[in-house]
Amino acid sequence: MTAPDSSSAPAPLAFGGKPRVYPMRLYGDPILRRKARNLTAADTLHVPGFEPQTVREVADTMLETMFEERGVGLAAPQIGLPVRMFVAVEYADDEEENEGQETPLRSRVLREYVMLNPVVKVINKKKDKSYQEGCLSIPGIYEDGVPRARQVRVDYTDLDGQPRSIEAEDYLARVFQHETDHLDGKLFLDHLPADITEDHRKDLLRIQQASKNFLAQLSEWDKAQRHLKENL
């Protein structure tokens, strides 16, 4: 999910080794419509295009990716991992402009969250439509009126493998619901009338083409790596 003041730009495309940030999976990528599987904190994860990493390493890189993309949350399917994991942050609301320069997002962080196998339970069923939503996988598209439960509890596992629970309301509750949706193959546009998605048809087609281009590059890189291994 994007921060309210976000102007996201794609991370540079570079495969191999341990990444500083991950390239973003975009609207149209089949992985964004898959239901993710559970994981444990002890798992080794393999983000396509990169070396295997621990769950903690992946979480750290996801946070770095999220900050670079000026987001407020990022789910594992958005980096090509079909596992039930997301990262999110709370930012300070009192951003001050300094001679026209954007305040670095990291300096505004109040709290970071890394959630494995999150389960959202609604506390207050009243729907809230007062916040604008966007998504790092659907860059440049924002909509008001996405209905979300006003208050939720999230039960999850932390990076040490311990069970945790947190209650959230208003915007943070929205973030947790948005990211958990990703783990079930849902996007925020799915909660809106079809004519709103149709209004964004031109932009969505452009994003889908960018997604196809990325997947083609990833496939070519993967073929090249397999060829190298076969000829060692």
Swiss-Prot record:
Look up the record and give one Gene Ontology term from the biological process aspect: translation
Which chemical reaction does it catalyze?
N-terminal N-formyl-L-methionyl-[peptide] + H2O = N-terminal L-methionyl-[peptide] + formate
Which residues does the annotation say bind Fe cation?
C135, H178, H182
Q: Which cofactors are reported in the record for this sequence?
A: Fe(2+)
- Which residues belong to the signal peptide in this entry? none
User: What does the record note about the cofactor?
Assistant: Binds 1 Fe(2+) ion.
Q: What's the name of the protein?
A: Peptide deformylase
Q: What is the native source organism of this protein?
A: Deinococcus radiodurans (strain ATCC 13939 / DSM 20539 / JCM 16871 / CCUG 27074 / LMG 4051 / NBRC 15346 / NCIMB 9279 / VKM B-1422 / R1)
